Swiss-Prot record:
This is Protein adenylyltransferase Fic. Its main location: membrane. Belongs to the fic family. PROSITE patterns: FIDO, TPR_REGION.
Length: 483
């Protein structure tokens, strides 16, 4: 009997150990499973899903956006849809404030009503409702997707539709509808963009054929010089009128009621533009030293200590957080390499100039004057390619910053198109000024409240009498006679 007891106890102990082992193993497996599938811990799945996002790489590919969806089938994307949509809705939804959640509900309601209006044939009302929905929830993929489809099929605005599909995919990479829509529109939009660039080249060549001694062209160049400074400082908040800006540049006299800084901003731009005309336009390569010298002149009268120097503190620009001061030297070296690389110089001049502008303002290397320096660099590159310096009207400031914001979010194309628009309007102005057209060409008719820089230019050009340029004024040099 005693022997039987002894042999029984080890068996019971073995059973107990096995039970404990399987219990612990099962508990651990359950914990790992929940950890991997919970919305708060999606690192392993999220890492792979991030590879499927649409990327814009500020440190490398400035023209192309990398669409990595192209290597995955729709079936594979659908396999991730349920998991990804749930994890995104859980994690993002939890971060919404009560007001934001209310806006999203209202936006979805407006979107559904817009779809009903469209079915009823009331497209005007549908368009207004879609705009309202987008204003309430500009980051909601469903709103972006449905509005894009409405624009594509009913408004025939395939470019804007493609932009919204791109945004929807950036927010929800597993959205197979947005993916399919973008596959349909991407090539068409690229073709339209390429045709636009061909048209710009044709207008540039037509302008280049006009002799530099043409009196009308010289008047247009002089007026554009004043306009360029007026609008560039105006974008940054300078309150000088065009007449006051002209007076400061021509007389060097102070304007009553205006701050010293506002005067100095205008004088700094004048110095920088003369430096471009006298030096940079003729150079084969633009170096980091050239950019620092350009900035030194921009801030030469406002803040000579910071002029031409990298910032030494962290700055914040709206929702954009530029690199820290410790990274600026390396990033600017990379920018210099990109600026002079064979790949960059093979781009169309308008694309190249717009991307250089964006890249520099994205790095934000200076404590002040980043926007003015970036626009001056952009125009330097355009002038080297035979284009006139582009005027970005200060009345379009909100659009300008909106497109920069979209570029920060991953889609550089709207900003490049905006610069192309400004380039075309500037070219049209010069061509109009040197032609025998009795009236304004249609695309130049703008009211001042809409940013009528070209209408203002036309008025001043028409009223100006031919006059010789002063030697060394910075207005008589440049490529193909551009200021």
């Amino acid at each position: 009997m005693e022997t039987g007891k002894v042999t029984q106890e080890p068996k019971q102990m073995k059973f107990t150990y096995r039970f404990a082992f399987f219990f612990i193993a099962g508990s651990l497996a359950t914990f790992v499973f929940h950890a991997l599938t919970s919305s708060s811990s999606v690192s392993l799945f999220g890492w792979r899903l991030q590879l499927r996002q649409l990327h814009h790489l500020p440190t490398a590919h400035y023209l192309q956006t990398r669409d990595e969806f192209a290597v995955y089938s729709v079936d594979e994307l659908n396999a991730f849809k349920e998991f990804y949509d749930k994890s995104v809705s859980d994690s993002v939804g939890a971060s919404y404030t009560e007001a934001e959640q209310t806006n999203i509900k209202e936006a979805l309601g407006a979107m559904r009503l817009a779809l009903d209006m469209h079915i009823s044939g009331k497209d005007d009302k549908a368009a207004r409702l879609f705009e309202h929905a987008l204003a309430l929830a500009p980051k909601h993929p469903e709103v972006l997707l449905r509005y894009g489809e409405f624009l594509e099929h009913n408004q025939r605005n395939i470019v804007l539709a493609d932009q919204y599909y791109f945004q929807a995919l950036s927010i929800s990479p597993s959205n197979s509808e947005a993916f399919a829509n973008r596959q349909r529109t991407a090539n068409v939009v690229q073709t339209l963009d390429e045709r636009r660039l061909v048209s710009l080249d044709e207008k540039r060549d037509a302008l280049s054929a006009i002799h530099e001694a043409n009196a009308a062209l010289r008047r247009a160049k002089k007026e554009a010089y004043f306009q360029h400074i007026y609008h560039s400082v105006g974008i940054e908040g300078n309150t000088m009128t065009l007449a006051q800006t002209r007076s400061v540049l021509e007389t060097r006299m102070a304007v009553d009621g205006k701050s010293i800084d506002e005067h100095n901003e205008i004088l700094g731009m004048d110095l920088a533009m003369k430096y471009i005309n006298a030096s940079l336009v003729q150079k084969l390569e633009i170096t980091l030293k050239d950019i620092l010298e350009l900035h030194r002149r921009v801030l030469g009268h406002v803040d000579p200590i910071e002029g031409g120097e990298f910032r030494r503190t962290q700055v914040y620009v709206g929702g954009h957080v530029p690199p820290g001061p410790g990274d600026l030297a390396l990033l600017m070296q990379r920018f210099e390499h990109w600026l002079n690389s064979e790949q960059s110089n093979s781009l169309h001049p308008v694309n190249y100039a717009a991307l250089a502008h964006y890249k520099l303002v994205h790095i934000h290397p200076f404590i002040d004057g980043n926007g003015r320096t970036s626009r001056l660099l952009m125009n330097t590159l355009l002038m080297r390619a035979g284009y006139p310096p582009v005027i970005i009207p200060k009345q379009q400031r909100s659009q300008y910053y909106h497109f920069l914001k979209l570029a920060n979010e991953g889609d550089i194309r709207p900003f490049v198109r905006f610069i192309a628009d400004c380039t075309e309007k500037t070219l049209d102005l010069y061509l109009w000024a040197t032609s025998d057209l009795p009236q304004q060409i249609p695309m130049l008719i703008q009211t001042e409240s809409e940013g009528g820089v070209l209408a203002q230019l036309q008025s001043h050009i028409a009223q100006s009498a031919p006059e010789p340029y002063e030697s060394g004024s910075g207005l008589d040099s440049g490529v193909n006679g551009m200021p």
